[in-house]
Structures are given as structure tokens and as C-alpha cells.
């Protein structure tokens, strides 16, 4: 597994939103609004998906992975250890900053956060919880958060 430590935030965003599209727990409506490259508004490249709230509203979510690194080699998973893909990881702070910037621009109403298992399920889960805690308590984010719970059987 090759890990590039010199990625900037946009590189990480591209890699980790692209890898998140394989998590079918939140699939988009199928609408593809591509930008022409001259301005803002290309939600396809930004990892925006759509889901429905309890009251039936369609809401936009930033769908990203915390990391696509994984210690496991599950054959069904795109992030499996033996798969030759570019690896990247966010920090909790980076995810919070991205979420808030997307929210302030009214691109999203919430965050869909999933992850590979970086070192251990417990350690990765602690980082995911730290991210949610920062969003709620430091950034005062009141939007929707859907977060994967990692277990190892």
C-alpha cells in the first residue's frame, strides 16, 4: 500500500470523495450536474450526494471517507489493503473545515462520513468520533451527520 504524504487538501478531497461513492448506504438521485471548468458549481467532483430526511425532504450531503487506507483485505471492498489505489487520509480538523465551507456556501445540509480502517477499528473510530465532536462543539455545526460505526468481528 503506497501512501502519498504530500497531498494537498484538494487532492485528498478528490481521492476520498471518489472512494466514498462505492458506499451504497447513501446513493445520489442520479442527476449529474457537471461544471464547465470555468467557475463554481460542479457538485460531481465534490462528493455531494442526496438522501431523504425523516420528513421526506431531499437533502444534500458531503459524502467523504476519513481515509481509504485499510489494514483489512476484504475482497468486496474498494479500499482493501491489496488494491493498488492512491491512498489518502484527512485529519478531523480538515473534515470539519471542509464541511463548514460546503455548508456556508449552501452546498450541503449534512455530512456522510465513512472510512477504511487505518490502524485499528478502535483507533479509526476514535478519530471519527473526534471529528463529530469537533463539528458539534467547536464549529457549532447543527446539520445532519451520518457516521459509519466500525467494528471488527
Predicted features and spans:
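Short Fe-S-cluster ligation motifs
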Residues: 101-114
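Flexible, acidic/Gly-rich N-terminal and inter-domain linker regions that tether
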Residues: 1-69
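Canonical Radical SAM [4Fe-4S] cluster-binding loop centered on the CxxxCxxC motif
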Residues: 64-93
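Conserved glycine-rich "GG(E/T)P / GGGxP" loop and the immediately following alpha-helix
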Residues: 111-130
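Conserved small/polar residues in nucleotide/adenosyl-binding loops
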Residues: 151-153
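Hydrophobic faces of well-ordered beta-strands that scaffold small-molecule active sites
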Residues: 60-62, 111, 143-147
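Alpha-helix-loop-beta-strand connector modules within alpha/beta enzyme cores
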Residues: 126-144
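Short, charged beta->alpha transition segments
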Residues: 63-64, 93-104
Amino acid at each position: 500500500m503506497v501512501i502519498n504524504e504530500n497531498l494537498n487538501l484538494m487532492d485528498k478531497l478528490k481521492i476520498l470523495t471518489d472512494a466514498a461513492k462505492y458506499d451504497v448506504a447513501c446513493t445520489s438521485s442520479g442527476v449529474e450536474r457537471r461544471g464547465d471548468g470555468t467557475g463554481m458549481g460542479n457538485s460531481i467532483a465534490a462528493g455531494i450526494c442526496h438522501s431523504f430526511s425523516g420528513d421526506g425532504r431531499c437533502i444534500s450531503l458531503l459524502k467523504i471517507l476519513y481515509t481509504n487506507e485499510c489494514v483489512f483485505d476484504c475482497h468486496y471492498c474498494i479500499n482493501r489493503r491489496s488494491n493498488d489505489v492512491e491512498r489518502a487520509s484527512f485529519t478531523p480538523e480538515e473534515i470539519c473545515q471542509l464541511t463548514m465551507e460546503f455548508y456556508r456556501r449552501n452546498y450541503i445540509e449534512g455530512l456522510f462520513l465513512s472510512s477504511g480502517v487505518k490502524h485499528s477499528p478502535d483507533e479509526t473510530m476514535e478519530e471519527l468520533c473526534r471529528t463529530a465532536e469537533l463539528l458539534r462543539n467547536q464549529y457549532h455545526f447543527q446539520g445532519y451527520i451520518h457516521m459509519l460505526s466500525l467494528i471488527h468481528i
